[in-house]
Regions:
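Terminal alpha-helical segments
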Residues: 1-71
């Protein structure tokens, strides 16, 4: 378990989620969607990191989901 690195991923994901919320309220939908996607990716990476599951350098959310399901 790599708890500290997982916590770092969670902090980054939370910042992206907050940014997405602010942008959504301002009607800036494309950037809100971008930060939402970034948050999802980072939450998945936090989970994988916590469970010591290697994911390499990727932005492939379906792959990350598959890796999470394999745990």
């Amino acid at each position: 378990m790599n708890e500290e690195t997982a916590k770092e991923w969670l902090k980054k994901a939370e910042r992206d989620l907050k940014a997405a919320d602010v942008l959504l309220r301002e009607g800036i939908y494309d950037y809100s969607l971008f930060h939402s996607q970034q948050a999802v990716e980072k939450y998945l990476k936090a989970f994988l990191t916590y469970h010591n599951k290697h994911f390499g350098k990727t932005h492939n959310i379906p792959l990350l989901i598959d890796l999470c399901q394999s745990i």
